[in-house]
Amino acid sequence: TTWCENPDSPRSECHGWSSAPIYEFSRMVLGAFPTRDGWSHVSVQPCPPEGLSFAEGSVPTPYGDLFIRWERRDGDFTLTVRKPEGAPLCVTAVLPDGLAVPMGSDCSLTASCTL
């Protein structure tokens, strides 16, 4: 189970309502969301919460996992995105300062800004 409000649950809490934290992590913390149907176009726009210095994870797409890592250190923010080789994903990374960086034909992108 994922909820601590009921530590002595008499039944399984492995249900759809327990999957919201995974969605929130992928969408808000990592910042990945489709901008066209079928995940053919993806935007990666992390919303780094206060107190969190880095996050990384993989977001499943129909073309394979999209790897995302961001780090905040000494006023700098660095975002790395990797898509599966040969995947027809159009990826745009949007940094916290608003700069949009398209991935292009490479399978990896690293971009930085000052916070």
Predicted features and spans:
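Non-catalytic C-terminal accessory modules of carbohydrate-active enzymes
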Residues: T1-L115
